[in-house]
Amino acid sequence: MIIPRFIRRMFRSPYDGMRHFAAVEEGVLYRCGQPTPEQLDELISRLNLKTVISLRGRRRADDPDGWEEQEASVCRRRGVEFISIPFNHKNPPTREQVGQFLAVMRDAKRRPVLLHCRVGQQRTGVFCALFRVHIQNVSPEQALQEMDALGFDVRHRRHQRLLEAYRRFAADAQALQPSS
């Protein structure tokens, strides 16, 4: 059955065109690929975002259009905290980076949070799975299955360092607890 374009537009999600957008926990954590400045502005309004966390790197090649400055500018204008926690498949996240992310997620005043990388699957998937394990008390295996189902692809050779980092940090609950 072919649905006319004007009818499809009537039922379009406000997040159409945004890569891999999903609520990890409604009102707490949302995930996606790199939003445009317009999409980010819309998300801030619709979701009442308090913090945006980018997991993208700062290399010039990774930012040909100045996405980071545009994103930071939208956040500044809207009074939203912008945090950059850059890592990639060759250089997985450090304990400090994971701890920084989890500290934000434990602070109710800094939520809701939008978490993204370029595509919204690998880097974002690792941090969302760690959120599920350390904040929502989901088993590491269940979080890994969810991460894979949402596009991580645990079998892909390129993702093995990220997968090893996930397993290490998922098992290391003691080290990632907030300091008293």
Locations of regions flagged by a protein language model:
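Cys-dependent protein tyrosine phosphatase-like superfamily
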Residues: 1-114, 126-180
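Short cysteine clusters
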Residues: 117
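Substrate/cofactor-recognition hotspot
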Residues: 120
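Glycine/aspartate-rich loop-and-adjacent alpha/beta segment that forms the canonical ThDP
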Residues: 123
